[in-house]
A protein has these predicted regions:
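Short loop-to-helix capping motifs
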Residues: 1, 78-81, 167-169
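Central hydrophobic cores of alpha-helical transmembrane segments
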Residues: 2-9, 169-183
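Secretory targeting signals
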Residues: 5-61, 86-165, 202-213
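Hydrophobic alpha-helical transmembrane segments in multi-pass membrane proteins
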Residues: 12-13, 101-102, 183-191
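Helix-loop-helix units of permease transmembrane domains in multi-pass membrane transporters
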Residues: 61-94
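Short basic/hydrophobic patches in alpha-helices and adjacent helix-turn junctions
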Residues: 161-164, 180, 184
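Extracellular/periplasmic helix-loop-helix junctions in multi-pass membrane proteins
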Residues: 186-211
């Protein structure tokens, strides 16, 4: 539950400057779109790095904790190393996916009185454009968070490898943060469709290097 609330809080904070008490009574056509604004925040690295940190805190830090508490020898008595690692990596992936999707949906529920889930249905949403001017836009919010989760999973895997070599919780979280920025900046010069920024921001049409405003 900690990870879900962390993700939801980050998502709400990322668009907090666009919400006000007065907006609750505004007509839907005057409200900002939750999907539009959350997608804008995912184009840049400011809040995306916080999602990586949240995922690392709840997953990668278990490796140094288990090593320090000598838990691994007891696990290996019941299973072999490969099975143990495969199960752990699968658990990390499943946790991140569930946490990101549930956290974004929770943020959407909180933001819904101040904003609207529907959007203009911009062509930047690609094949999902028909969904965006109806309540079905919640589906896109799920896809957006799933897309983000899939991009964070390999970052956490690399951070886990560092955490095994250097069993320290702070190193584990820092490794995830460092790996994220390496990917973010070193892929920045690649074509948009191949950049890490694109892969983590626009599941509808990742090849378009534009931001929805």
């Amino acid at each position: 539950m900690t990870g879900i609330f962390l993700v939801a809080i980050i998502a709400v904070i990322s668009v907090s400057d666009l919400i006000s008490i007065d907006s609750i009574n505004w007509p839907a056509e005057l409200k900002q779109s939750i999907c539009d604004q959350l997608q804008i925040t995912l184009v840049f690295d400011r809040y995306k790095s916080l999602y990586v940190i949240a995922a690392s805190i709840c997953t990668v830090t278990t490796f140094p904790s288990d090593i320090k508490n000598h838990v691994l020898p007891y696990i290996r008595q019941r299973t072999d190393f490969d099975s143990m690692m495969n199960a752990r990596l699968l658990a990390i992936a499943a946790y991140i996916i569930v946490t990101m999707i549930t956290g974004f949906l929770l943020a959407g529920v909180f933001l819904n009185p101040f904003m609207t889930i529907e959007t203009r249905g911009s062509s930047l949403y690609g094949i999902f454009q028909p969904l965006m001017n109806s309540k079905a836009a919640w589906i896109y919010l799920v896809l957006m968070s799933f897309n983000l989760a899939m991009s964070i999973i390999p970052v956490c895997y690399l951070a886990a490898a560092v955490a095994i070599l250097k069993p320290d919780e702070y190193v584990a979280v820092g490794a995830g943060f460092f790996v994220f920025y390496l990917l973010f900046y070193f892929t920045g010069s690649l074509p948009w469709i191949l950049s890490y920024s694109s892969l983590t921001s626009e599941p509808g049409r990742a090849s378009v290097g534009e931001v929805i405003y």
